[in-house]
Every structure is written in structure tokens, then in C-alpha cells.
A protein has these predicted regions:
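Bacterial N-terminal signal peptides
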Residues: 5-13
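Boundary at the C-terminal end of the N-terminal hydrophobic targeting segment
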Residues: 18-20
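A short beta-strand motif characteristic of beta-propeller blades
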Residues: 24-31, 74-82, 125-133, 176-184
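Residue-level detector of Asp-centered blade-edge/turn motifs that repeat once per structural unit
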Residues: 42-45, 95-96, 146-147, 197-198
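Short loop/turn segments immediately following the C-termini of beta-strands
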Residues: 54, 105, 156, 207
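Short loop/turn segments immediately following beta-strands, especially the blade-tip
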Residues: 61-71, 113-122, 164-173, 215-225
Length: 228
């Protein structure tokens, strides 16, 4: 399998979708590590890349000698999550990489791990899990706001983005459900989601449409205010 990296060039104000254009740049083959790659995440400077492997049931870590340039990537290590989840899908980190979060649809949980040092999966240890089964039986992607007091899980069964609050940032044991936003008009099998820095733009990828759907949020990181 190959990871295809699309560089989206946005105007800093994110005023209109006309200001964004996707241009194919390069690809990087990860088939030696996994044949069913799922979510893709970078560290802040792009010198580390992480890919969820559903076949291997693990998180694969790569280094990039040039940040965000996949042609410079090389495999480092992997971390097996099968003791907690046999169908891992989505992945997220806190800001310094000392916490890693994995969501999967075997147990329908967001799993929390500690890493020391940050962004080094070889040091990961399991901490806790938070069930999202009441909201969706096929959770496939997740994201947090900047301080970890909000968590978002996209679900393939109900085709929505579920929002949670965390009373302690990046601590899933303190999570509680808030609201959901339906994306079925745009995508009937959503896979993953990302936000811009202030949460006023949300991007949802989908299997059926094979595209990236963009939404505006009049209140940052509040899905009840989202519009396509």
C-alpha cells in the first residue's frame, strides 16, 4: 500500500473553499509494515510520521529527514495494540506526543497511552479506555482541540462527528458526550477528521466519496455550529 500525501494550500483566513487546492506531490510505500493502512498523523515539525496498521494491529513510526517530505521517510519501529484493540482505525497525539490515542471498532473505545519521550511509540504504555459505543458502533477517526478539553470521534455507522468534553485535558477517563453532527449528506462512510488551529474549519475524509469535505464552524470546535 502507498500513502498519498496531498498538500492543501490555504489562505490564512480560510475565507472560502476557492482558496484551497489539492495537488498530488509524492507517495511512500509502507507495504513492508502493513497492507491495510488507516489513519496518518505527523508530529508538529513533520520529522516523524505515524500510520495505523489494521493488518498488523499496530502503530508504525517513521522518521523524515526533511519535515513533511515523505520521500525522505524511513521506518523506525512499531507498537502493537492488539491487547487493547484488534481493529485499530484512528490515531491522535497530545501536543508534545507524551500521550497517544487510538480508536477502533472491535471494542468501540478511545484508548489512551503514555509515551516517554514524546512521539516514540516504543515507549508506549496503556493507561485507560473510553467507550463511544453509545454514540457509534464503527468509530474510525478522532481529533482533539488544542488543550485536549474537547474530543471528536467520527463514526461510520451513523455517519456523524461526535463531540465530547474532557474535564481534564487529554484524559479520556474524564470524557462525556456533548453533541453530534450529521455528515451523511456529504459522505455515507466517513473515515477521519481534522480541524484547523482555531477549530473554525473541520475536514472529513470519506471512503465512498473518496474526497475531503470541508465545513465551517461559527464557534470553534463546536460541531453544533458546523455547516458544509
Amino acid at each position: 500500500k502507498k500513502i498519498f500525501i496531498f498538500f492543501l494550500i490555504f489562505n490564512l483566513t480560510f475565507v472560502s473553499s476557492a482558496q484551497a487546492a489539492g495537488v498530488f506531490v509524492d507517495s511512500f510505500d509502507i507495504s513492508n509494515e502493513d497492507t491495510l493502512p488507516q489513519s496518518l498523523v505527523f508530529n508538529p515539525d513533520g520529522t516523524k510520521m505515524f500510520v495505523v496498521g489494521r493488518a498488523g494491529k499496530d502503530i508504525n513510526e517513521y522518521t523524515l529527514s526533511t519535515g513533511f517530505d515523505v520521500s525522505t521517510a524511513s521506518f523506525v519501529d512499531s507498537f502493537d495494540v492488539r491487547n487493547e484493540e484488534t481493529q485499530p482505525k484512528g490515531l491522535a497525539f497530545n501536543n508534545d506526543g507524551t500521550k497517544m490515542f487510538v480508536v477502533g471498532y472491535t471494542d468501540d473505545e478511545v484508548l489512551e497511552y503514555n509515551l516517554s519521550p514524546g512521539f516514540d511509540v516504543s515507549t508506549a504504555t496503556f493507561v485507560d479506555g473510553f467507550s463511544v459505543r453509545s454514540e457509534d458502533l464503527i468509530p474510525s477517526g478522532l481529533a482533539f482541540n488544542n488543550d485536549g478539553t474537547k474530543m471528536f470521534v467520527v463514526g461510520q455507522r451513523d455517519d456523524d462527528v461526535n463531540e465530547y468534553t474532557l474535564s481534564t485535558g487529554f484524559d479520556v477517563s474524564t470524557a462525556s458526550f456533548v453533541d453530534a453532527f450529521d455528515v451523511s449528506n456529504e459522505e455515507s462512510s466517513p473515515l477521519d477528521l481534522k480541524f484547523n488551529h482555531n477549530g473554525t474549519r473541520m475536514f472529513v475524509t470519506g471512503y465512498n466519496g473518496k474526497d475531503v469535505n470541508e465545513y465551517t464552524l461559527s464557534t470553534g470546535f463546536d460541531v453544533s455550529t458546523a455547516s458544509f
